[in-house]
């Protein structure tokens, strides 16, 4: 006995949602080849009944950080070294000619220098001025020369022409330590004891004694 043929359902008869598993299998090559009516397959495609599963692949994100462009670096066009009396810098020589040749604002430098050295009247303060290509400048104050500090401490006006025979003054060990402490940043040493010996040597060459003395005279040895 022949079985009755069942007609394939038309697209209009499908009203309920199709399960995900069934939708995934409808577009496989095997399922499409079994359809007796190719028009049904086109209906499935046109009505978007196939629901593709969400992608599980990971997308790689590349983050590019843009570093800020650095500003234009200033170029040093000159370094000027001067020794000026504290609080008394003026546009007169040597300041005016030295800075004017580099295009530096002379009055601005004098004002800044005098303000920073106002607490050291009577001292000669060395200064190192760095000039840039945009006419701006910076400067560093050095400590006064050791000879100036020794004359101030001893009360002498100038050093001796013959320091071995003629003495012009005397300082205490505490005064020597104070001068060495002030000069330490500019000396080629790291300890206060070494700085004191360096300053003591300068004092000896100027005819200034130290009480008590810290430098021991070397004895001459006679070799027969």
Swiss-Prot record:
* Protein name according to UniProt: Large ribosomal subunit protein uL11c
Which Gene3D superfamilies does the record match to this protein?
Answer: Ribosomal protein L11, C-terminal domain, Ribosomal protein L11/L12, N-terminal domain
Q: Which UniProt keywords apply?
A: Chloroplast, Methylation, Plastid, Ribonucleoprotein, Ribosomal protein, RNA-binding, rRNA-binding, Transit peptide
Q: Where in the cell is it found?
A: Plastid, Chloroplast
What CDD domains does its record include? Ribosomal_L11 (cd00349)
Q: Listed GO molecular functions?
A: large ribosomal subunit rRNA binding; structural constituent of ribosome
Q: Which residues carry this modification: N6,N6,N6-trimethyllysine?
A: 75, 111
Q: Which SMART domains match?
A: RL11
**PROSITE patterns (UniProt xref):** RIBOSOMAL_L11
Q: Does the keyword Manganese apply?
A: no
Q: Where is the transit peptide?
A: 1-66
Asked if the record carries the keyword Flavoprotein, the reply is: no
Q: Which family does this protein fall into?
A: Belongs to the universal ribosomal protein uL11 family.
- State the GO CC annotations: chloroplast; cytosolic large ribosomal subunit
Q: Name one Pfam family in it.
A: Ribosomal_L11
The record's section on InterPro entries has: Ribosomal_uL11, Ribosomal_uL11_bac-typ, Ribosomal_uL11_C, Ribosomal_uL11_C_sf, Ribosomal_uL11_CS, Ribosomal_uL11_N, Ribosomal_uL11_N_sf
Biological-process GO terms, alphabetical: translation
Q: Which organism is it from?
A: Spinacia oleracea
Q: Which domain of life is it from?
A: Eukaryota
Describe the subunit structure.
Component of the chloroplast large ribosomal subunit (LSU). Mature 70S chloroplast ribosomes of higher plants consist of a small (30S) and a large (50S) subunit. The 30S small subunit contains 1 molecule of ribosomal RNA (16S rRNA) and 24 different proteins. The 50S large subunit contains 3 rRNA molecules (23S, 5S and 4.5S rRNA) and 33 different proteins.
Sum up the protein's function in the record's words.
Answer: Component of the chloroplast ribosome (chloro-ribosome), a dedicated translation machinery responsible for the synthesis of chloroplast genome-encoded proteins, including proteins of the transcription and translation machinery and components of the photosynthetic apparatus.
